[in-house]
Amino acid sequence: MARRRRAEVRPVQPDLVYQDVLVSAMINRIMRDGKKNLASRIFYGACRLVQERTGQEPLKVFKQAYDNVKPRVEVRSRRVGGSTYQVPVEVGPRRQQSLTLRWMISAVDGRPERTAIERLAGEIMDAAQGRGGAIKKKDDVERMAEANRAYAHYRW
């Protein structure tokens, strides 16, 4: 068992442009090596690109993409009687957010566009329309949970 106290969850401050906590969390996920200014430029640049290409409010498109990528169920390994089962469990809201943002960033990293701004904008627009790498990852995870529904009674 852990000897230390459980780390308290610090509230995320909303971003300066949209006053939105989710945008701030996304910027924090984009950030590498503490370069938050660069991460902010990438995100807001992608928002400008989304605005130009779709003609819609970028925050609305981002939220739509977020909701499309958000997983409902996932599988967790559970060892019972010498064998390991992949048990489907519902995903809590904090884990939903972290998985969604993580999948979106990893999908952005795998895209072919030249700049980070173009890659992020492309992934946000694709995810908002129900396609792209992050959506594929979500579908894979939910398909795995559906395939292992027989082990749902092992849930803890």
Swiss-Prot record:
The keyword Isomerase does not apply. PANTHER family: RIBOSOMAL PROTEIN S7. One of the primary rRNA binding proteins, it binds directly to 16S rRNA where it nucleates assembly of the head domain of the 30S subunit. Is located at the subunit interface close to the decoding center, probably blocks exit of the E-site tRNA. It comes from Deinococcus radiodurans (strain ATCC 13939 / DSM 20539 / JCM 16871 / CCUG 27074 / LMG 4051 / NBRC 15346 / NCIMB 9279 / VKM B-1422 / R1). The lineage of its organism: Bacteria, Thermotogati, Deinococcota, Deinococci, Deinococcales. Part of the 30S ribosomal subunit. Contacts proteins S9 and S11. Pfam families: Ribosomal_S7. GO terms for cellular component: cytosolic small ribosomal subunit; ribosome. Keywords: Ribonucleoprotein, Ribosomal protein, RNA-binding, rRNA-binding, tRNA-binding. Gene3D superfamilies: Ribosomal protein S7 domain (1.10.455.10). GO terms for molecular function: mRNA binding; rRNA binding; structural constituent of ribosome; tRNA binding. Belongs to the universal ribosomal protein uS7 family. GO terms for biological process: ribosomal small subunit assembly; translation. This is Small ribosomal subunit protein uS7. It comes from the Bacteria. CDD domains: uS7_Bacteria. NCBIfam families: rpsG_bact. InterPro entries: Ribosomal_uS7, Ribosomal_uS7_bac/org-type, Ribosomal_uS7_CS, Ribosomal_uS7_dom, Ribosomal_uS7_dom_sf.
